[in-house]
Amino acid sequence: MEHISTFPLPPVTLVLGGARSGKSTHAERLATGSLFGAVPRPAVYIATAEAGDVEMATRIMAHRARRGGAWTTIEEPLKLAEALQTAAAHGQPVLVDCLTLWLSNLMHAEADLDEATDDLVMALDGYGAPVVFVSNEVGLGLVPETPLGRAFRDAQGRLNMRMAEQADRVILMAAGLPLLMKDRPVRA
């Protein structure tokens, strides 16, 4: 899988996977260039999670500890396109973790999902730094029992398809292993 480690990163990379599949760790290593032991480069982390309970606060603290202090962190649960514009000023690779929590936040805020996704895709057009997105693949499991659960699963599937269409590289993580699903050559 030598081509997965090729740098520079393509303009847009999407890292998908289930819970605890290794997607965040892999995406962090892609963004910093440290996937195969290289010295990490600076990067910007856009966090979409909100610490609404103790378990989520613990997860956020674990992610921060793993990343260390070299990252510039922008916390934005809803306005992802605006956060990308803020991150552009740093001129460094950007990691967005994760689209799934962003979608959940949008649904709870009763935002227009199509409009928010359109805004995100438009923000990527001509963006000046590589962007790595993390998203959950929620459509491989059981059918959710509730209408809201099914609506979320369907919306997540549509968002993932839209972002995969936009992405130059798509990686599916399973059991900590990357499976390259799409790899458009990096434009020089």
Name the predicted role of every residue range:
Residues 1-11, 93, 116-119:
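SAM-dependent methyltransferases
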Residues 43, 94, 169-172:
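Short, well-ordered beta-strand core segments
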Residues 66-115:
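Helix-adjacent hinge/juxtasegments
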Residues 2, 9, 13-86:
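Conserved P-loop
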Residues 27, 63, 95, 136, ...:
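Residue-level signal for inorganic ion chemistry
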Residues 37-38, 86-89, 124-127, 164:
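Conserved catalytic network of the ASCE P-loop NTPase/AAA+ motor domain
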